[in-house]
Amino acid sequence: MQPTPSEYARTPVRIEMQRSKERNSMVYKEMYNDAQRKYSEALDRISKLTDAYLREKAEVENFIKIKDREVEMSKKNANEKLLKDFLPVLDSIDAAIQAEKDNNLIRIRDQMLGVLSRYGLKPIKAEGSKFDPYLHEVVGVTADGEDGMVKYEVQRGYTLNDGVLRTSKVIVVKR
C-alpha cells in the first residue's frame, strides 16, 4: 500500500530533507546578510576615500593657484628694484627741465618714461588733484586754493603695476 501525501511528508527522509532545506536557507540568509554588510562597508569605504581624494585634489588645486598667483606677482614686480634705482635719474632730469626748459631733455624724459611704462612704471598725477594719502606725502601746506587739493608737486611719485612705488611729495591746500 502506498502512503498518503500527509504520511509521505512525515517520513524520516522527508523530515530530514525539510530540516536540511531550512538549515541551508538559514546559511544562505546568513551568507546573504554577511555579503550585504560587506557590500555596505565597501560602499562606505569608497565614499570616504572619494571624499578624501576630492579634498586632497581641491587642496592641490588651491595650492597650484596660490603658487601661480605668487609667480605672477613675482614676474610683475621683478623689476621693482631696478625701476626704483631709475627714479633718482628721472628726478635729476625733471630738475634739469625745471632749471632750463630744454626740449631735448623733455624728449629724453618722455622717451625714458615710455620705456619704463612698458614695465609697469607710471607717474602719479598730483598737481590739481584731490589729496590722497596713499599716493601723496604732504611736505608743506598753503592757504592759497581749494581746501584738500594738491597745489604743488615737489617730487613726482610713481606706481608700479597698480601699487605705489614712491609717493608724490606735495604741498596741499589747508584752510
From Swiss-Prot:
- Report the main location listed first in the record: cytoplasm
Pfam families, per database record: GrpE (PF01025)
Q: Does the keyword Cytoplasm apply?
A: yes
Query: Can the keyword Chaperone be found in this entry's annotation?
Result: yes
| Cell compartment(s), UniProt | Cytoplasm
Q: Which GO terms describe its biological process?
A: protein folding
Give the UniProt keywords, A-Z. Answer: Chaperone, Cytoplasm, Stress response
Please name the GO terms that the record assigns under molecular function.
Answer: adenyl-nucleotide exchange factor activity; protein homodimerization activity; protein-folding chaperone binding; unfolded protein binding
The Gene Ontology CC terms held by the record are:
cytoplasm
Matching InterPro entries, A to Z? Answer: GrpE, GrpE_coiled_coil, GrpE_head
User: What exactly does this protein do?
Assistant: Participates actively in the response to hyperosmotic and heat shock by preventing the aggregation of stress-denatured proteins, in association with DnaK and GrpE. It is the nucleotide exchange factor for DnaK and may function as a thermosensor. Unfolded proteins bind initially to DnaJ; upon interaction with the DnaJ-bound protein, DnaK hydrolyzes its bound ATP, resulting in the formation of a stable complex. GrpE releases ADP from DnaK; ATP binding to DnaK triggers the release of the substrate protein, thus completing the reaction cycle.
Q: Subunit comment for this entry?
A: Homodimer.
Q: Which family does it belong to?
A: Belongs to the GrpE family.
This protein is called what? Protein GrpE
Source organism phylogeny: Archaea, Methanobacteriati, Thermoplasmatota, Thermoplasmata, Thermoplasmatales
The gene it comes from is grpE
